[in-house]
Amino acid sequence: MTDIRPFRIDIPQPDIDDLRDRLTRARWTPALPGAEWSKGVPVDYLRELAQYWANEFDWRKIEAELNQFPQFVTEIQGQPIHFKHIRSERPDAPALLLLHDNPGGAMGLLDILEPLSRDFHLVVPFMPGFGFSTPLTSIGWTVPRVAAVFAELMDRLGYERFGAHGGGGGANVSLELGRQVPERLIGLHVNAYVAMPGEDVEGLTEAEQARMATVERFMQDGFGFNIMMSTRPQTIAHSLNDSPIGLLAWVVEKFGEWSDPAAQLPEQAIAKDRMLTDVSIQWFTGTSGSIAQSYHDVAHDPGAWGPKDRVTVPTAFVLSAGDVTIRRWAERDANVARWTEFDRGGAYIALEAPELVITDIREFFENRP
C-alpha cells in the first residue's frame, strides 16, 4: 500500500475517564527508607504529579494543539507510519525531516514546529511502534531499517532532497540516513548524539573528561532502563501498560535524569504538561510494549555495535549542558560542519530551550545547497 490517509487524534472519552479512575485508585507503594531521587522517583513527588494528571491536566486542550498540524498515516514495509506534514508558505523552502527521541516522542518536537515551518516543509513521523505508528506488525526494527522507511516516506511525499534533524535515537537514524542516501541529503543536524569512545583518550580537555565521567556513571547507575527493555520487553510491558502510575514514574524519571543537569526537579527543565503529554500518548496508544521492543531490536542487531562507515554529509552537532559527545569521536563518525555548545539544556533541548534549536537549525541549513 502506498496511499496516504488523513489522520486526526480523537481519544474516546471512556479512555480518558478510565485513566482518571485508575489514577485516583492508585495503590501507592510505601516510601523506602532514605529514598531520594538517586533511588528513583520519590513517592510524595509522584503522588502530587499523579493528582495533577488526574485533576488539572487537560487532555482535550492538548489534543487540539496536536491536531492543529496536518497529520497522516501511510504503510511502509507493512508498518503503519503516522506523521505530521507541514508545508511552508515559502514555495522554495527545503524539506526537513524531524526525528524524535524517547521519552519525548514526536511531542518532544512540538514547540519547534510552527517557527521552523516558516522556513521548511516539515515531516515529523513517529518511529515504528511509537505513538500512533501502531500497531507494531513485525520485529527487527533496527536503526538501518527505520532509516530506510523514512527515506521511503520522503520519497513518497515527493522530496528528492531533504535535510534531517534528530535527537538521541533520532540522531542515530539521521546519521544512518547519511550512510544510506547521502546524495539526497542537504545536511544533517543532531543533538544528544553519543559517539562511542575511542582509544585516543590522551589530551582530552577538562570538559571532555567530565563528559566521559558522566557516561561512566550512566553505565553504572542509569542503564537499567535500557537493559530491562532491551532484554525483557514483554515483562516490562505488562507493568507499564496496566498501571498509569508505573508508566508515569518510568517516563518522568528519565525526563528528570536526562534533562538540564542544573534542574532540581523534572518540571524545572520541562513543563509538566509537556511531560504528561508524552506519558498520555503512550498510555492511550498502549505502546509501552512496542517501545520496549524497539530497544530489544536495536540491542540485538549484530551491526549496531561495530564500526560504521563515516557519514560524509555535512553534519551539525548541538551540545547542551547535559550532552556527552566528544568532538574527536564525532569527527570519526561524521563530517562535522558545525559544532555548537550551549550552557543549558539536556537531551530534550527542543523541549527545554526550543529557541536555541530553532536558531541553530536555521543558521546551519540557510546556506546548504
Language model region names:
Residues M229-P369:
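C-terminal subdomain of alpha/beta-hydrolase-fold enzymes, centered on the catalytic histidine
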Residues D92-D101:
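Short beta-strand element of the alpha/beta-hydrolase
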